[in-house]
Amino acid sequence: MWKYVRKYLYFAIPAALFMVGEVSMDLLQPGLMRRIVDEGVLRLDAAGAGGLDLIFTLGLTMVGLVLFGGMCGSLNNMFAHLASQNIGNEIRKDCFRRIMCFSFPQMDRFGTGSLVTRVTNDITQIQNFVAQFIRGMIRTTMLVAGSIFCMFRLNRQFGLMLLCAFPLLAGCMAVCLYKAGPLLPRLQEQLDEINSVMQEDVAGIRVIKACVRETYETIRFGKANDALVGTQLWVLVIFAFMNPVMNALMYIVVVLLLLSGSVQVGAGTTTPGAVMAAITYTTQMLNGILNLVMLFQTLTKGAASWKRVREILDTQPELADSDFEGKTAAGAGVEFRDVSFGFPGAGQTVLRHIDLTIRPGETVAVMGATGCGKTALVSLIPRFYDVTEGAVLVDGVDVRAWRQRALRDRVAVAAQKSELFSRTIGENIAWGAPGAPEDALRTAAVTAQADGFISAAPEGYGTMVAEGGASLSGGQKQRISIARAVLKPAGILIFDDSTSALDLKTEADLYAALKAAKPETTKIIVAQRIATVRRADKIVVLERGRIAACGSHEELLRTCETYREIYDSQMGEEEPHE
């Protein structure tokens, strides 16, 4: 954390100095009060004269010290929060940048809910940690040490009594922190769980309602929430027990001071003002220790949060970047050389010994049963994952040798799930090509068969999209996603089952418009419908992670039983084999 703190020492150091000023003013107050009592109040005669001038002068001095201390405290608070907010801002930006570099498996390992909690709640805890450390640590240390020092200067016996009380107070605090310490990291983990459940349920609310699972999900959330509340209550009980115990110890010390002070005042070895000052110093020390307890609670939470945030910052991207930039071309060739692949941590191979060559400008369709590896295959081209064996080449260069940004600039993907952002329709389409002119944006929408419903909207391309595209139908979301891919100036265009929500006529019109608009672009289409793939230059049939057959529609009807079965199930009754 030091690398973040040192950048804002120009806030932290003034904050510390102002806190020294505030605590110094607090420690001067009991001494002035002693003089007011001993040299002012006790010397007043029956007419009220005698020490009145001294009382007035010292009283004004105390008011001045209070005002000066308050000003120092305010400035300390301001500079401490400037330091903590800026440090938190830097950490948050670094975390987000690192998350943006994570591979898909790394994202899966952390989990969306956990990442959100770490970048929001955990960094807030770190900000509180920094602010409280700058404010609380200096104040507490000076109050405790200063109170004991001033007590010894005031009266050695009083100082010894206070010094003897300190281990008891500190021991009580240590026991509570020992009990509460392990619970604080658990709070963060349970908060992760609540966030994960909440995100899943909000995102899947339509499925939950359709399956009538509201009660089940309510119970699941309730269990996670009850676990969090249970841990919070244990922490509260521990600290609730500590406060009365420490207050009782303080009052015992005060009573002992009064008894000892009374004896010493009677013997003439001390003064009533000194007894009052001793009680004030005792109260200041106890307040310092109580503040230390709250400070350690904040520090423990902050340390646990920093450990979780460091897990993000210390995680190196799994996909090492290279420096090959490639060249600009309308189409790009793709080659799979003996490629095998399994999702990290899944323990099984999804693709086995894939050999496939796709020429620039060629349209290739990929078909197969659910789970045969179609999405995995096309995900290797933009290097969303690394192959387990073999190599994937784009323009004759292994994708691992490409700079990732340059490679993904060459590939446009319309994914299975249409991800839309809470922005206008036009901004969503231009997401992959920021700054694209309006006529290009409209042309892409026309190609994707989306211009009709967009133009019919009240604000056209300026219509805001609800979160997750909730205001649009499935087919509309898919067409906006396709328009986004079409607009991007890429050499390879991947449609990963991205027309599944479209009717056959709209889909046919879309592919006809796409062929006319991007004749030189390499197109890879993952689909389930024969009508979608039959006009492709080449159709790849996957079966259990292997290429079962590859050829044109007519060739596969003659040579591939799997393809013929798919054809018969979908279109066999509509037209004869060709």
Model-derived regions: residue spans:
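Transmembrane helices of ABC transporter permease
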Residues: K7, F11-S24, Q132-L187, L256-T270
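Transmembrane helix-loop-helix hairpins at lipid-water interfaces of multipass membrane proteins
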Residues: R6, Y10-L75, F79, F152-F158, ...
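Short intracellular "coupling" helices and adjacent cytoplasmic loop segments at the cytosolic face
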Residues: L44, Q85, K93-T117, N121-I123, ...
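Helix-loop-helix
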Residues: R43, C150-C164, W234-K307, I312-L313
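Juxtamembrane helix-loop junctions of ABC transporter transmembrane domains
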Residues: L17-F18, M25-D38, F56, L65-T112, ...
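Hydrophobic alpha-helical transmembrane bundles that constitute the permease/transmembrane domains
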Residues: V20-L28, L67-S74, I126-F129, F133-A145, ...
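ABC-type nucleotide-binding domain
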Residues: G48-G51, K327-E578
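An intracellular "coupling" helix at the cytosolic face of ABC transporter transmembrane type-1 domains
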Residues: K7, C101-P105, N121-V130, I134, ...
